[in-house]
Amino acid sequence: MMIPVILSGGSGSRLWPLSRKQFPKQFLALTGEHTLFQQTIERLVFEGMDTPIVVCNKDHKFIVQEQLAALKLETQGILMEPFGRNTAPAVAMAAMKLVNEGRDELMLVLPADHVIDDQKALQRALALATVAAERGEMVLFGVPATKPETGYGYIRSSQDALLPEGVARVAQFVEKPDEKRAAEFVQAGGYFWNSGMFLFRASRFLEELKKHDGDIYDTCVLALERSQEDGDVLSIDEATFACCPDNSIDYAVMEKTQRACVVPMSAGWSDVGCWSSLWEVHEKDDNGNVTKGDVVVQDSRNCMIHGNGKLVSVIGLENIVVVETKDAMMIAHKDKVQGVKQMVKTLDEQGRTETQNHLEVYRPWGSYDSVDMGGRFQVKHITVKPGASLSLQMHHHRAEHWIVVSGTAEVTCDENVFLLTENQSTYIPIASVHRLRNPGKIPLEIIEVQSGSYLGEDDIERFEDVYGRTSTPIERGVSVKTIAQ
């Protein structure tokens, strides 16, 4: 059986402001009813393909579990990284887990946030790649370069009579080129876009990783030994993983190994890595415009207009991207959308929170939506799922007022436990130990008014939490060196 390894740790910053660090693009429904993450797993349900291993950031654990449960999709485990260290360590942890379990199978490594339109073409490429991988080769899926795209890395192929027909040896990896050089690649032929998809046997990858980047290999061995398992979730040891070098599969292994080969894949692939890529994969109107939401377009061509609540009207635009969300708007020329990543970096440096979360934030117990905020107050609309509860917690700098809009709330405030129903309210003083729970069968909705000198989400001390959310040593400011000792 072939085992997919879904890499779901990306931040998707080039699709800001829709994609945020705490809710990145792989968890958004950008090209259909289901999210990119869900689509990735759905397209791998066919004969000969086992259920996948998912590698994700710890902050996305509950999003992954919810999106899997929503479609009744199964996995054989979730590897939870405390923070990203690029793709080489992520794949190494998955490979080591399989080998340790006596399952030295072929691993199909693929990102969670790509689009593939032609399922049959994908399966044909997989069949060809399997022949090479069974012989010990390390296969990369290359998309034939049909235009001078500057947002992708390129692969140059060469013939090798020892490889199966249709499989080529990788002669060269090329960094993202400028437009002139990219055009030369397309004209020359034999160049492919690097899809970021790979196929190899688990033990072969580990053998090559140990040979070419022993620091990653050794650190991952130790991190796996120290990891904690809870059901199907493996939490990678934070202190050890912090010492792991940050490197991609390409740099750590594929550019150094003598076994790298490429299989052509013409399957309607896109990494939807920027707004112009997303425009390309969508259906367009007669003027080449792509619109979503409450949008009115007049005398405009080849635009991407995305509304999310407000009416967005545009007049006389051409090749422009407009994205509106509740708390941010981004306007860019389609030729300049690669600059969105730098814009996000600039906003981060300015301490802007709009890069981290949407106003509506999802939690394992439900969600909250920031309705209004001032210097010493914040108003939230909180929804708690039936049977769910927030952690038993305390805030050092803020008090809270709760008003029930619908449903029934079970409130714990210090030693008191009581019920509130629609239109009833209560007050939670600063430093009171409290909890909100929904004992009913319908969603609980409340309005929460916070007031105090500091209203950040990190002003929280948890005493009990059914979801296992506890402060980590690094979050408490303890150094990695101290932990390692």
UniProtKB/Swiss-Prot annotation:
The gene is algA. It comes from Pseudomonas putida (strain ATCC 47054 / DSM 6125 / CFBP 8728 / NCIMB 11950 / KT2440). Signal peptide: none annotated. Belongs to the mannose-6-phosphate isomerase type 2 family. Co(2+) (for PMI). Keywords: Alginate biosynthesis, Cobalt, GTP-binding, Isomerase, Multifunctional enzyme, Nucleotide-binding, Nucleotidyltransferase, Transferase. Produces a precursor for alginate polymerization. The alginate layer provides a protective barrier against host immune defenses and antibiotics. One of its GO terms (biological process) is GDP-mannose biosynthetic process. It catalyses: D-mannose 6-phosphate = D-fructose 6-phosphate; alpha-D-mannose 1-phosphate + GTP + H(+) = GDP-alpha-D-mannose + diphosphate. Its cofactor is Co(2+). This is Alginate biosynthesis protein AlgA. Pathway: Nucleotide-sugar biosynthesis; GDP-alpha-D-mannose biosynthesis; GDP-alpha-D-mannose from alpha-D-mannose 1-phosphate (GTP route): step 1/1; Nucleotide-sugar biosynthesis; GDP-alpha-D-mannose biosynthesis; alpha-D-mannose 1-phosphate from D-fructose 6-phosphate: step 1/2. One of its GO terms (molecular function) is mannose-6-phosphate isomerase activity. Its EC number is 5.3.1.8, 2.7.7.13.
